[in-house]
Amino acid sequence: GFGSLFKFLAKKVAKTVAKQAAKQGAKYIANKQME
């Protein structure tokens, strides 16, 4: 039903957000190391 579809989408979004956050975090750490 609708609930399972919503859960599926939420999982996908969470994964994408986590990936983006990891990228941003790595960039931030790299910049800090450069200083």
Swiss-Prot record:
| Source organism per UniProt | Cupiennius salei (American wandering spider)
In terms of superkingdom, the source organism counts as: Eukaryota
Q: Which InterPro entries match?
A: Cupiennin
Phylogenetic classification of the source organism: Eukaryota, Metazoa, Ecdysozoa, Arthropoda, Chelicerata
Q: Where in the cell is it found?
A: Secreted
- Its biological purpose: Has antimicrobial activity against E.coli, E.faecalis, P.aeruginosa, and S.aureus. Has insecticidal and hemolytic activities. Probably acts by disturbing membrane function with its amphipathic structure.
Record flagged with keyword Membrane = no
> Where is this protein primarily located?
secreted
The tissues in which it is expressed are: Expressed by the venom gland.
Which terms in the Gene Ontology molecular function aspect does this entry carry?
Answer: toxin activity
Record's family?
Answer: Belongs to the cationic peptide 04 (cupiennin) family. 01 subfamily.
Query: What is the name attached to this protein's record?
Result: Cupiennin-1b
Q: What is any one GO biological process for this UniProt entry?
A: killing of cells of another organism
Q: Does the record's keyword annotation contain Secreted?
A: yes
